[in-house]
């Protein structure tokens, strides 16, 4: 068989290249040493001793530069670099000069590792590592190896820091859950039993859930728990306590567990209330709104951000400062309790607690724009949480946009690792709030023609006031910044044991939150009356429904809320051991009025003609007039407990105020 000579030569050549490539890595170190010895032999042939010394020095330098230092670099654990380097020097470098040079380089690696470990911040570690590479390495190949080692260490430290941050977050969440469980355990055991029963019902099929929940409610009623509106601690089958069972399935009531933590650090937290429309379709009027609560420690700084939603801020406690960026203009305002200010969507803003002792409390009412009931924050600065939005862009884009180098980007972006709310020194706080004194505060003026600054509710006369309470409100017609959102802001201070109402809003639906104290709330609701009302003759026409109002009850503590829909009569009672402080945000606020159903003044029922009242109530005119004219106060009244005490001391018999509700068939 004939063999093509050229093909055979090609095959032999390729085979020789393959054998050479497989042996070169094994013989690399030996080849380097032979080359080094050959270099020195050639030096010995030179004529003068000076030339010989310079030649040998060049051989030494050439050999040192050819050492592959990547084999002494541990990619996974920098802590072992030092130990492995020394061990490999002893094993792989045979010549005394090479041993000496190798050991010297290992010593540098060890010192580098000690200095690296002393510095806790990964970014500073990285920068110092890069400086050492530039200081000690002159050969490009060695410089690249050193820089790659810096990169690997930096990435590993970032992963470790992120892991520590996530562990801290989990620990904080676990503590929060434990606290909520402790609060649950403090409640009445029978109430917990009822809630457990309802949770078991939720696991059943939909058609079985209703009957199951009815059994839970019936079982709860049969326990016959004590207490009533006048004295919740009293035994017996009082009216008020039996209403607590309704609180758990009350679509208008939001307890503290309805607040989810958006951000939490050692310096404060930001919580957002459950989506209104997600809770119940009865709250569809609020589907574009969210409520956010912020608490910040003294001398705390809240990172700059902007929202994809319009926001109204109400300061409910403490003293702060607000910075807003409108295009290329910065506005600065000192904030005090009672201040109201609007932040338009897309406006970058940041907050400072300028008080040394008191926490800053702010409520934010958001009107969403992009997705109904959903909003997002956008932070230009941050680290792991929040992540800065600038870090989303590619390195090339940022270098071009900011006209800078990658090293400077790395030194700035992503370095804030303490979270959204961080601590600032008093000197930093003074510097941040220095120009706030130059910003004029809101001057109360009808229509708000002159300023975008804050409006303070307490700088105007109370809307309603007597010895039982005070109420303050700012409406869109008072403050121009509220007109676009058509939102009002309301604050009421009800003295201990007193009450406000009953009353209803003519146009506005309000979200009412307890800032301090405790509140007992009763509200008449026609939408939950299906369990009691019915359709006559089985007819399905809406106009033939029986009219019935469900009595909605709730007991509110601090940070808990209730929604009062438009037209729903409602009463707030200060039931705790201190005054009750409420604040509220109302939508559809323009031309809204509170219509009161009791009291000497502003009582709409008193304006009805006596003959009409007699016909409507089917009772003698005198009895009707005495009933609705017996209250000497207006808006705020003595509460049920105070009224009972006054009645027991008085020789004149008075009809209890709560009987008004019974009188109208509540």
From Swiss-Prot:
Pfam families: Cupin_1, Vicilin_N. One of its GO terms (biological process) is defense response to fungus. The lineage of its organism: Eukaryota, Viridiplantae, Streptophyta, Embryophyta, Tracheophyta. InterPro entries: Cupin_1 (IPR006045), RmlC-like_jellyroll (IPR014710), RmlC_Cupin_sf (IPR011051), Seed_Storage-Functional (IPR050253), Vicilin_N (IPR006792). Residues 161-191, 221-251 are annotated as: Disordered. Keywords: Allergen, Antibiotic, Antimicrobial, Fungicide, IgE-binding protein, Plant defense, Secreted, Seed storage protein, Signal, Storage protein. It is found in: Secreted. This is Vicilin-like antimicrobial peptides 2-2. Residues 271-410, 455-625 form the Cupin type-1 domain. The gene is AMP2-2.
